[in-house]
Amino acid sequence: MCAQDITMMLGNIAQIDAYKQVYASLGQKCKVHLAVDTGMGRYGFSWDKLGEEIATFAETVEITGTYSHFNNAEKMAHLQLNRFKQALETLKKIGANPGMTHMSNSAAFMTLGDGGLDAVRIGSAFLGKCARGAGDDRLSGWL
């Protein structure tokens, strides 16, 4: 992966120990996309503890991006987006560049757009489908 210049996902401290072993032996920094848990509870550094966790290893990685996932694009979207933006501010305060930022999937993109971030991760919308339910024709004409 090092030779191919692959960016790794990083969502917990255990991963960084493994990355450090490999990349330090090569004299390289591991390129990572930081995962931030803003409420989904599946994967990522907790949004409210991000600063203290990242500070322990920030100098050993190159952050190329920071992302999160919406638990529910409608019910908690604004709360999660605000948490994510707070996490991004925390990174900046400790001198870490968050890189490319992204959070919206297809359903979130339909309601929030890009959320003021750098990118979106549409999947089903790219194919002209919408996970929001049958009869939603807002995607017709996209393809």
Give the residues covered by each predicted segment.
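Catalytic beta/alpha-barrel core
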Residues: 2-16, 68
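Active-site loop/helix belt of alpha/beta enzymes
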Residues: 20-26, 31, 36-143
